[in-house]
Amino acid sequence: MSVTHDVVIVGAGPAGATAAQVLAQKGVTVLLLDKAEFPRDKLCAGLLTWKAVDVLERVYGDTAEGLLASGVFDSASPGYRIRFRERTIASGEMFYPFHFTMRRVFDKHLLDRAVRAGAQARLGEAVTFVDPATGVVRLAGGEAFRAKHIIGADGVASVVRRACPFDAAAWKHGMGGAMEFYLPYDDPRLSGAVHEDLRAPYPTVYAGFLRAGYGWVFPHKEKLAIGIGGHSLLHGREFRSKFRDFLEFLGLPRELADASRGHGLPYGNYLAKPWHDRVLLAGDAAGLVETLFGEGIYYALRSGELAGEAVADALTRGVDPAVPYGKGLRRDILPELVWSRKLRRVLYASQSWGFLPLFCFVRGGGRLLGEMVHGVRSYRLLLRRAKGPQESGCAVR
């Protein structure tokens, strides 16, 4: 016999935990399921922009200062550098710092907050069956639950999404991929003649190594996140060899690429209508990842918040949750994904012409591009979309 809940959320990462937090605060009975025990490691560069911190403050009451003090954020930097291979396109300081986190710590913090708000969590057992029509969700061990509403927040390989009639071929066509590893600062391989960026206290991104993608070096408190990511269809099996080239450029052993981990990444295959019957999809499960730089944490947090609010409306006012959810996505998320994909096509196509097109674009955009990345301005023609932090502007040199 199945146990009935108002809402079952599959996936306890940022999207699922945020939806659970919103619903539990409203007194809704929420069951949060995840195949992993928490804390667990998650492959992610772990960079948060201002817009992500804004959601954390609104939903959880967390501030950047408080998260840094508690160790949930491990470092912050207003600085940045953008390179086309060795040549610097731009460097400077943003009006607001980038914050860095380890997903093992960050996701556990959000889950703990949702449970403290009243959500029930069942961890360590995979969901193997979902019926969007009846709201039945079954675990690998055979235990079943029935829900009035299901939120699928179970990542890029979502079991919930695959139970719905979405176009699997289109999803696969738009997939990206990433390879990444962490290198502790005390690793002896950093003591030799390595690239200066490996000792920089700010994040650096690199064009020119992939036709449709980029590389990165992000500084955390105790280690560096080093990786590449891009469109799988264009690069496929080249990823590892391109990663070796990138590591050689940084002065690191090429064989580090062979020990690195890879994962799929939504890269333009977002679902414009991520719902079916009793199901709403959020975060990576719906492909809601920014399609230029691959930023995913903000879109997971915001779509989780929107999904939670939409289901709460459905339970209290009897509305179809797809209506408020779709409205929120069309207002806050989908335009950013559409226009970042347009920008990606232009910028990646221009890489074949070398350094100059990217240099002119970044230098011409200046302060406005910094506001776009942090979410104060939209990818849609750089229109203003939020008030942002008190100070505005960024220095570019």
Question: What spans do the regions from the language model cover?
Answer:
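FAD/FMN-dependent oxidoreductases across multiple families
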Residues: 129, 144, 234-310, 315, ...
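Residue-level detector of alpha-helix initiation sites
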Residues: 13-14, 38, 298
